[in-house]
């Protein structure tokens, strides 16, 4: 059901957002976890890697980022000359909160022979302390390019790091963070659903705990889950990630049934991200009208955080198991001096 689009004392929100977008030469980027009404008016809807690429390439003057704070910060870092607005600056992330920069810095200093492979769900300050940033859709391709004998710190998501360790036979040191949304999925409720829909595959995000992943037929990023759900021959798909992605599934494959795996005891909305939900059409309208709140970061911080992000963008096109594309990352001392460039991906 589509939410009402008129409020703020009768303002036609869709019409005004469209007008302001043109007037401001703005682009609206939205994550798959946003409410359907925001996804439907966005210029681009995608996962963190998709949206990072769009932010880096846009010729718009203003980026209206409908997501959470670390995503908007990433857009600002990659497009420092753009005005980046976030409808609600309180839209944070439990993973970001779990990894304070001073503690992450101390963790790095205690393990000087390790490079830091860091999940994008972190603050700009933690990115600046990292060697390479990854998203859930690029992590496997990037890890595949790092020599097996290179010691690695991975954070802040311990479940994604554990999944990568198991899949690649690695022994990365893991920061103990979790996503509160994916942590809430219930193994008991998942098994009930599997019994209710025999043969229906489970598509799970690697931020889920191992007991959810082990019952899943497919594990991948939001974009990979979406692709699987649309292309699968199965007519019923069980989805173990934030349920607002189901909106895109239903638009692309309306003849199929997509069922979100419950959290907790099955009677709560604890698998919906409370931070993503803070963004609304009303707040987006006000942000475009006032160009506030803006993401503002110190130039030196953006410069330091941009290097590991650029490595991610350069390395993300590698095909796992097909050999290195360009030079692999070698060791932490070369990364720290900035003498190793990320591989150049053909066609990008």
Predicted regions: what is each one?
Residues 1-239, 246, 250-261, 265-348:
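Active-site loop-to-helix "anion-binding N-cap" substructures in soluble metabolic enzymes
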């Amino acid at each position: 059901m589509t939410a009402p689009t008129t409020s703020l004392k009768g303002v036609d929100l869709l019409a005004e957002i469209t007008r302001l977008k043109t007037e401001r030469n703005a682009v609206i980027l939205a994550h798959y976890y946003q409410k359907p009404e925001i996804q439907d008016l966005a210029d681009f809807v995608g996962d963190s890697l998709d949206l990072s690429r769009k932010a880096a390439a846009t010729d718009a003057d203003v980026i209206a980022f409908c997501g959470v704070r670390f995503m908007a910060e990433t857009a600002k870092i990659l497009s420092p000359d753009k005005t980046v607005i976030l409808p609600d600056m309180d839209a944070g992330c439990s993973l970001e909160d779990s990894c304070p920069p001073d503690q992450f810095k101390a963790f790095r200093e205690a393990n000087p022979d390790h490079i830091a492979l860091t999940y994008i769900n972190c603050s700009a300050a933690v990115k600046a302390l990292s060697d390479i940033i990854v998203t859930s859709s690029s992590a496997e391709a990037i890890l595949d390019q790092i020599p097996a004998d290179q010691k690695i710190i991975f954070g802040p998501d311990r479940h994604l790091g554990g999944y990568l360790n198991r899949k690649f036979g690695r022994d990365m040191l893991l920061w103990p963070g979790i996503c509160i949304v994916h942590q809430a999925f219930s193994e008991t409720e998942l098994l009930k659903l599997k019994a209710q829909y025999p043969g229906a595959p489970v598509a799970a995000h690697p931020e889920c705990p191992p007991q959810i992943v082990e019952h899943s037929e497919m594990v991948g990023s939001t974009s990979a889950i979406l692709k699987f759900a649309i292309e699968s021959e199965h007519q019923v798909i069980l989805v173990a990630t934030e349920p607002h992605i189901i909106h895109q599934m239903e638009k692309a494959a309306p003849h199929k049934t997509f069922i979100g795996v419950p959290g907790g005891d099955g009677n709560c909305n604890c698998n919906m991200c409370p931070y993503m939900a803070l963004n609304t059409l009303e707040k987006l309208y006000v942000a475009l009208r006032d160009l506030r709140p803006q993401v503002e970061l110190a130039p030196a911080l953006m410069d330091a955080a941009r290097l590991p992000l650029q490595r991610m963008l350069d390395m993300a096109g590698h095909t796992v198991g097909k050999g290195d594309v360009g030079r692999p990352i070698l060791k932490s001392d070369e990364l720290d001096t900035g003498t190793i460039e990320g591989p150049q991906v053909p066609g990008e």
